[in-house]
Amino acid sequence: MTKSIFEYKDDQDWYLASFGSYNHLTCFGDDEAYEQYVDFFQGLTSTLDVSGFQLHVVKHSSDLRLVSFILDCLKEELGRDLVVTQHQGTLLVSEGDKLLYVHVPREGVSLDDFFGSDNKSDFGDVLLIATRNEGKTKEFRKLFGKLGIKVENLNDYPDLPEVAETGMTFEENARLKAETISKLTGKMVLSDDSGLQVDVLGGLPGVWSARFAGPEATDAENNAKLLHELAMVLDDSKRSAQFHTTLVVAAPGRDSLVVDADWKGYIGREPKGDNGFGYDPLFLVGNTGRTAAELSTEEKNEQSHRGQAVKKLMEVFPAWQNKQ
């Protein structure tokens, strides 16, 4: 069987190609030219899952002409319906309704040119944090920024309705908020629900932690209520408890991602420490004898339920996001 030889030749460009047992590139020119071609060649053939394509570059002036030649070869030999489109200095390779490869010139392109200055903010993955707390948002922005993801919060969407936390578990509440807001906005949404669980109280205050002493209760009132409930529990070992956090990430058309974590300790007999919030002044961390309110912010973030849950999330999030 005769092997097909493909050729394109004009005054500025001359390419030869065939199919063999492995991908291979040769060219006339210096090492710098070869490195430029081989990076492009390997990236394109790998992304398109092509094997056995052998290319020789005799003369080259146009990246568009080279890509068009390669795609013509693949169409004729393999029946691939690949199309190249020029866009603001880049070359976009698509097949059907899928964008498969983007070739950017070595000097790069302006983001304003590529996206359009009026629409640039609409591009790229966005994670909406279901909170109005700018401090919490800032921390998540640092973490997800490393993954190339823009982070927004509810302050960016003032017209969104409040989602009532009517669930009976932390996961139900976190899932309810994340999935509801995701449906309303069409965006990827992260929500959390956290609280204190005291074993001798059957897990209370649990999902009612913020309103244990009443709908508008202050931290001091909730702490006083908890001490009252434990007044007759004299054995310290019976005052075991844990802070719990559940994080849920929801996105349209996919199963939600759920992670959770606990921070174990005991309930003290009086508030201690000036840091933190909520039940921190009563929560004795493990067997340290120190309350969460006596820890520095760095110490707390390193070991707390929320810190542990966020670490778990960052470990599993990339795989979840890439899952089709």
UniProtKB/Swiss-Prot annotation:
GO biological process terms, semicolon-separated: nucleotide metabolic process; purine nucleoside triphosphate catabolic process
Cellular component, GO annotation: cytosol
Region NTP pyrophosphatase, annotated ranges: 127-324
Cofactor(s) this protein cannot do without: Mg(2+)
Pfam families: Ham1p_like (PF01725)
EC numbers on record: 3.6.1.66
Binding locations of substrate: T131, R132, N133, E134, G135, K136, S194, F277, G278, Y279, D280, K300, H305, R306
Family statement drawn from the similarity comment of this UniProt entry: Belongs to the HAM1 NTPase family.
This protein's name: dITP/XTP pyrophosphatase
